[in-house]
Amino acid sequence: MNGEEEFFDAVTGFDSDNSSGEFSEANQKVTGMIDLDTSKNNRIGKTGERPSQENGIQKHRTSLPAPMFSRSDFSVWTILKKCVGLELSKITMPIAFNEPLSFLQRITEYMEHVYLIHRASCQPQPLERMQSVAAFAVSAVASQWERTGKPFNPLLGETYELIREDLGFRFISEQVSHHPPISAFHSEGLNHDFLFHGSIYPKLKFWGKSVEAEPRGTITLELLKHNEAYTWTNPTCCVHNVIIGKLWIEQYGTVEILNHRTGHKCVLHFKPCGLFGKELHKVEGHIQDKNKKKLFMIYGKWTECLWGIDPVSYESFKKQERRGDHLRKAKLDEDSGKADSDVADDVPVAQETVQVIPGSKLLWRINTRPPNSAQMYNFTSFTVSLNELETGMEKTLPPTDCRLRPDIRGMENGNMDLASQEKERLEEKQREARRERAKEEAEWQTRWFYPGNNPYTGTPDWLYAGDYFERNFSDCPDIY
């Protein structure tokens, strides 16, 4: 059995693990509240139903068809205990640990706060534009807060499109590679103000009590009016207590955003939790010019908000803070030196809000989640709408779109048995297609992206070939 044959995307019951500044956010939020009464089909937007219109703007569903399945009866330890330190691309997980979205739809969540891109495009000065781009980069990972379910691994050739006229963008993504798993995406402003694109290769590892996801791949944002391109890589995400205890998530690592035209750079440090949880969710950084002079300081939490201030005021505040910390210094935790064991890591207690330095400028604030989000996989309002299938959509979508994937649809509807059966069928179909290609010595041909080099960094990337929205889908593969 070769490397391809060893990889599983769909096995019965299992799944592999490659797997506000000067602008208001109020008009950017998806309207509505979650309602668990699934009989109210006109409100939740069940499969095949057309959302209503309000003032000419399409209203999207505000709930999933069924609440999430309980994970309390499943133990991940029996699966992961032999995998410490290993990459998880070939390790199967119970489907109960998934969420009813494809990874391609998860990537689309970058666009929830797309108003920050529109804002950047309208700002006259490069420093102001970088502030908004930095806020967008942080907001792009905010949806991962408390999202402990794993998205479904995309099948080779799977696609996802999203057009949001109310938010001013359209988006297309494709699973372009299976080994390694690579997802490519391209988005553009409907007013031709930006291009946003990249390719993501998520690398997952298990470290005993946690799973670490390193999102390899370059993210590129082009502001067309200013002839500017910004590139960066997302921080590492870690899910703690995957064996026992309450699951919790942190992001850590350094993100560098470079303006390739002006030389401005934003350096953002996503802080690891640290002792006593003092640094949990914190983001700190600065914007510098091409001569490395600090122009603007940034601070906040990726789960909450982002603020900025001039360097002099920031350093003055930090000096006072350090003096206070020295006076209040606590003794070390008595248990901090004990060996790692099967004891859960206590969920750190974070401060409720960010301490705002006087004179600071609000760059971004997270959208409030629906009241019953916890029963909907901790989805945001934007996320809840991603898999809705409206009347007539099947006639315009390619047959490879995630919305048409039956295992994800089954899980969304609360039918776990059907979801597992369909996963098994889809995986076997994918394996058979690989065997046929191997027999015929045929290479897989992507449809909407092609391999190349990023035009700004020179690193390997997948580039959009164009023409998707011409909607000629006659040569799309039958993957479902």
Curated annotation (Swiss-Prot):
Taxonomic path: Eukaryota, Metazoa, Chordata, Craniata, Vertebrata
Outcome of mutating residue 423 to A: Loss of increased cholesterol and decreased phosphatidylinositide accumulation at the cell membrane
Name this polypeptide is given: Oxysterol-binding protein-related protein 2
Main location: cytoplasm
GO biological process: bile acid biosynthetic process; cholesterol transport; intracellular cholesterol transport; phospholipid transport; plasma membrane organization; protein homotetramerization; regulation of presynaptic cytosolic calcium ion concentration; regulation of synaptic vesicle priming
Organism: Homo sapiens
Documented effect of changing residue 249 to W: Reduces 25-hydroxycholesterol binding. Loss of 22(R)-hydroxycholesterol binding
Keywords: Cell membrane, Cytoplasm, Deafness, Lipid droplet, Lipid transport, Lipid-binding, Membrane, Non-syndromic deafness, Phosphoprotein, Transport
Bias kind Polar residues: ranges: 15-30
Modified residues (Phosphoserine): 19-20
Places the protein is found: Cytoplasm, Cytosol; Lipid droplet; Cell membrane
Tissue-wise expression: Widely expressed.
Domain of life: Eukaryota
Gene (name only): OSBPL2
Self-association state and partner proteins as the record states: Monomer. Homotetramer; phosphatidylinositol-4,5-bisphosphate binding promotes formation of stable tetramers. Interacts with DIAPH1.
Role: Intracellular transport protein that binds sterols and phospholipids and mediates lipid transport between intracellular compartments. Increases plasma membrane cholesterol levels and decreases phosphatidylinositol-4,5-bisphosphate levels in the cell membrane. Binds phosphoinositides, such as phosphatidylinositol-4,5-bisphosphate. Exhibits strong binding to phosphatidic acid and weak binding to phosphatidylinositol 3-phosphate. Binds cholesterol, dehydroergosterol, 22(R)-hydroxycholesterol and 25-hydroxycholesterol (in vitro).
Residues where a 1,2-diacyl-sn-glycero-3-phospho-(1D-myo-inositol-4,5-bisphosphate) binds: 90, 178-179, 427-431
Chain intervals for the UniProt region annotation (Disordered): 1-60
